[in-house]
Swiss-Prot record:
Pfam families: Ribosomal_L19. One of its GO terms (biological process) is translation. The lineage of its organism: Bacteria, Pseudomonadati, Pseudomonadota, Alphaproteobacteria, Acetobacterales. This protein is located at the 30S-50S ribosomal subunit interface and may play a role in the structure and function of the aminoacyl-tRNA binding site. The keyword Ribosomal protein applies. GO terms for cellular component: cytosolic large ribosomal subunit. GO terms for molecular function: structural constituent of ribosome. Belongs to the bacterial ribosomal protein bL19 family. The gene is rplS. NCBIfam families: rplS_bact (TIGR01024). Keywords: Ribonucleoprotein, Ribosomal protein. This is Large ribosomal subunit protein bL19.
């Protein structure tokens, strides 16, 4: 492992210890709490939508969240380990067969719905 890979692994471990990053993927509905600074005021703003893409690139990992606001589709790309993200919460799990859900951009209403994934049952080992 070279120096850069070692540094990125250490940074990911440090940032993961400070804030829990849940497992989520495309199709999942997430609520991202973002720290917003307006002048001297600081507040936390929630952004809730469907994850349409996720790019796993170590420390540079990011994910794209799409929501419909006032009838318009709004997409926002969040770096996974950004210090401006206070919390990521998975609201519901979606069942999809694609890694990138860019086809949702051209859909409206019921055709843009994503079926909910069946809950994973944990069987007790006897």
């Amino acid at each position: 492992m070279n120096i850069i890979q070692q540094y990125e692994a250490d940074e990911i471990a440090r940032l993961s210890a400070a804030r829990e990053v849940p497992e989520f993927g495309p199709g999942d509905t997430v609520r991202v709490s973002v720290r917003v600074v307006e002048g001297e005021r600081k507040r936390i703003q929630a952004y809730e939508g469907v994850v349409i893409a996720r790019s796993n690139k170590g420390l540079n990992s990011n994910f794209t969240v799409r929501k419909i606001s006032n009838g318009e589709g709004v997409e926002r790309v969040f770096p996974l380990y950004a210090p401006t993200i206070a919390e990521i919460k998975v609201v519901r799990r979606g069942a999809v067969r694609r890694a990138k859900l860019y086809y949702l951009r051209g859909r409206r209403g019921k055709s843009a719905r994503i079926a909910e994934r069946a809950r994973e049952t944990v069987s007790a080992e006897a």
